[in-house]
């Protein structure tokens, strides 16, 4: 069992599942403040955690399945290249997790089921081909990160989905920016591996400008939840800290050409953006 949890990257699954829970709680706070008839189901909330954990684990397992040749060189101790789990077992286990997660999602409501099904398809395509495609790989990671919060809100149906659209967009934009910056950081190693990332395709400078554009867009859009009276003044205060980190991250990638530092700053910006939604709801 320990080996299969390692294949799933259980720690990563838990963090994603926690993000789903945050989505549930934020959507509940927003909706319950507008209507006294909104209730929070502990059972459905538990299912959200389990579904995100399982589907994320399925995606991670499938990623290892397709990366077997690369991992033989770069990560020989991983479950598949080390021989702890056979290639076929890893594939069947990942498919089992996908099916279980999607089935549980439809038990919550049809909207959750549709999102889980669509995200599973994106994860499969990402592991198979999208991650090797310039920009579309970055966009896939951005969407999947943002949709984790959206999935949590979907427990309340379309109203919950609409309540978290801005959080979804901010998380997606910021993640895409950081993913491109990470590709700029890894450009030397990626060239040696024959990868086709955005910086390799158009150059580090142009890719940095694209990353900065996504970061700026996320920053400029950050006041929207307050202006629309979705979140309170506390949100505005904390998100301002996130915006400062976004600005410094952009400066580091454009002015200092320091992709590693910029990537870390984008990560801090995303953390404070998440905190701002929690305190502002």
Curated annotation (Swiss-Prot):
EC number: 2.5.1.42
Taxonomy, superkingdom: Archaea
Cofactor: Mg(2+)
Function as written in the Swiss-Prot or TrEMBL entry: Prenyltransferase that catalyzes the transfer of the geranylgeranyl moiety of geranylgeranyl diphosphate (GGPP) to the C2 hydroxyl of (S)-3-O-geranylgeranylglyceryl phosphate (GGGP). This reaction is the second ether-bond-formation step in the biosynthesis of archaeal membrane lipids.
Organism: Methanococcoides burtonii (strain DSM 6242 / NBRC 107633 / OCM 468 / ACE-M)
Keyword Lipid metabolism: yes
Membrane topology qualifier: Multi-pass membrane protein
Pathway info: Membrane lipid metabolism; glycerophospholipid metabolism
Transmembrane segments: 14-34, 38-58, 95-115, 149-169, 207-227, 235-255, 259-279
NCBIfam families the UniProt entry points to: PRK12882.1
Record GO terms (molecular function): geranylgeranylglycerol-phosphate geranylgeranyltransferase activity; magnesium ion binding
Keyword line: Cell membrane, Lipid biosynthesis, Lipid metabolism, Magnesium, Membrane, Phospholipid biosynthesis, Phospholipid metabolism, Transferase, Transmembrane, Transmembrane helix
Lineage: Archaea, Methanobacteriati, Methanobacteriota, Stenosarchaea group, Methanomicrobia
Catalytic activity: sn-3-O-(geranylgeranyl)glycerol 1-phosphate + (2E,6E,10E)-geranylgeranyl diphosphate = 2,3-bis-O-(geranylgeranyl)-sn-glycerol 1-phosphate + diphosphate
Protein's name in the database: Digeranylgeranylglyceryl phosphate synthase
GO cellular component term of the entry, any: plasma membrane
InterPro entries named among the record's database cross-references: DGGGP_synth, Prenyltransferase_related, UbiA_prenyltransferase, UbiA_sf
Matching Pfam families: UbiA
Family statement: Belongs to the UbiA prenyltransferase family. DGGGP synthase subfamily.
One GO BP: glycerophospholipid biosynthetic process
Localization (cell): Cell membrane
């Amino acid at each position: 069992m320990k080996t299969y949890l390692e294949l799933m990257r259980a720690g990563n699954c838990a963090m994603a599942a926690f993000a789903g829970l945050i989505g549930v709680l934020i959507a509940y706070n927003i909706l319950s403040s507008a209507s006294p008839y909104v209730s929070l189901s502990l059972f459905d909330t538990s299912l959200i955690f389990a579904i995100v954990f399982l589907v994320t684990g399925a995606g991670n397992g499938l990623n290892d399945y397709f990366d077997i040749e690369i991992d033989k060189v770069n990560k020989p101790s991983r479950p598949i290249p080390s021989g702890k789990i056979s290639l076929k077992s890893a594939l069947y286990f990942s498919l089992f997790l996908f099916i279980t997660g999607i089935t549980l999602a439809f038990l919550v409501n049809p909207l959750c089921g549709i999102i889980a099904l669509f995200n599973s398809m994106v994860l499969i395509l990402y592991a198979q081909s999208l991650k090797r495609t310039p920009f579309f790989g970055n966009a896939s990671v951005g969407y999947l990160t943002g949709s984790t919060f959206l999935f949590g809100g979907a427990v309340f149906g379309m109203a919950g989905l609409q309540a978290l659209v801005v959080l979804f967009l901010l998380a997606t934009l910021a993640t895409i920016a950081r993913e491109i910056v990470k590709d700029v950081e890894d450009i030397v190693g990626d060239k040696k591996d024959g990868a086709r990332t955005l910086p390799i395709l158009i150059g580090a400078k142009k890719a940095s400008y694209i990353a900065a554009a996504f970061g700026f867009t996320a920053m400029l859009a950050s006041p929207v939840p307050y202006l629309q009276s979705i979140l309170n003044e506390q949100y505005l205060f904390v998100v301002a800290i996130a915006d400062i980190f976004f600005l410094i991250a952009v400066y580091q990638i454009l002015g200092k050409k320091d992709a590693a530092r910029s990537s870390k700053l984008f990560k801090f910006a995303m953390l404070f953006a998440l905190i701002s939604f929690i305190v502002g709801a």
